[in-house]
Amino acid sequence: MDYTKKIMHQSNYWYNDGLGKAKIRDMSGAIVSLRRSLQYNRGNIAARNLLGLVYYGRGEVAEALVEWIISKNLRPRDNIANEYIQRIQDAS
């Protein structure tokens, strides 16, 4: 397995770990795992969007928006982050 595949594998591993923790409402643990996923692959859109949702669920709207805006800039089209950002703007 080459270096790039190992990095992607690690990023996906930590994303799945964070997803599992978010499902059982371990938000602090999910944040740690999702940040680690992004350390391996900053372009992991799923991890970034989930991290935004976790922040939003904790009431940290500004932190959520930061993650979603980065996600939107990485993938402008076909990105659920666009909808999340729009909902925040509509609620304001």
Where are these regions (language model features)?
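Register position in tetratricopeptide repeats
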Residues: 23, 57, 87-91
